[in-house]
């Protein structure tokens, strides 16, 4: 009789335990949404600061929520995104610690390390989504979109006021979503603002859209004029200009050398016919003959066609990066690498002694004028290579001379970063902005 009673109790307890387990719901995903829209069912662009809310069938164990159970990665460089994760019963709030990059693709992954309060593991889940806006990589410190009057910097901490805006008109930009562009007349148009040299850093990127107009862009003798597109202190800081025949384009730069004292002006000049191609030489005679071109590691070759079809009266995206850690500087046109130098390669006994110190470069910088009174200052200028009060370069470089190489055309979306962007970032930024 006792045996029967104990067996009955045992079966009852076992049955109760079995029934209890059957009532436990597995941890399944019900929905994942941003701003009330289910990402699982709708292709949507997510705002860069919007939290994502995941809802499950049963309560989540807060101790199972971690950087390995809930992950977000940026697709273009596979960078992990730091997340703020908050559990409330069956809901999980997933919020980036800092705003996501606009116009970028991300992947959200939830792994079996996530568990319910009963210890049941989640299966697995991954979903991709794209953020709103045009792709703009991190570390942007200044941006001019020319939508406001005066056309001030609208991003970052640089924030100067455009103190001189001379003969600037506005025109429709490169596409419907780009608003307006600044139009320069080729003789007097200019925008300038103070303290441009503050933007020159050991890690640096400048990117802008331009539409050069060569029609009627001639001097008083009928000769074609080149184009000073923008600048900080002419060749002594940073300036970009284009040859009148489109044989070359150039970023002149001021460079701070490794002793932290010496500052020199140097040209980063892309010859589109491949004139500097394959100039990393192995014998002493060639090294001595090629000078700065010994630093060339990549050079597109467009032959006699030059740059005309890429730059003349068409919208073109120009990007230049400088990277102290690799001693490299790179020019891109329309997201494609055109020209690259590695200045550390100048550290060679067969290279001219005058050029070897460039191998120690540490930063872009404004080379100060040693003459009194100074012939230029550190204003950032759009439409010319130096501020309009400057006297450097004589008549040919003077703003007041209508025969000088004033820029004629349109400018838009000028961006500056305190980081050297990668090839992928430059390409994505071009694709997003075109």
What positions do the PLM features span?
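Short, tryptophan-glycine- and acidic/Ser/Thr-enriched carbohydrate-recognition patches
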Residues: 145-172, 428-431
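Short surface loop/edge beta-strand patches of beta-sandwich-type extracellular domains
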Residues: 135, 183-206, 302-308
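Short, aromatic/His-centered strand-loop micro-motif at the edge of beta-sheets
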Residues: 256-317
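Flexible glycan-contacting loops in extracellular carbohydrate-active proteins
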Residues: 343-409
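Short hydrophobic/aromatic patches on beta-strands that form ligand-binding or substrate-lining surfaces
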Residues: 142-145, 206-212, 318, 414-415
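Acidic, low-complexity Ser/Thr/Gly/Pro-rich repeat segments typical of extracellular/periplasmic
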Residues: 22-137
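Extended recognition patches within non-cytosolic domains
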Residues: 136-138, 399-400, 410-434
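Short tryptophan-centered beta-strand motifs in secreted/extracellular beta-sheet-rich domains
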Residues: 208, 313-323, 329-331
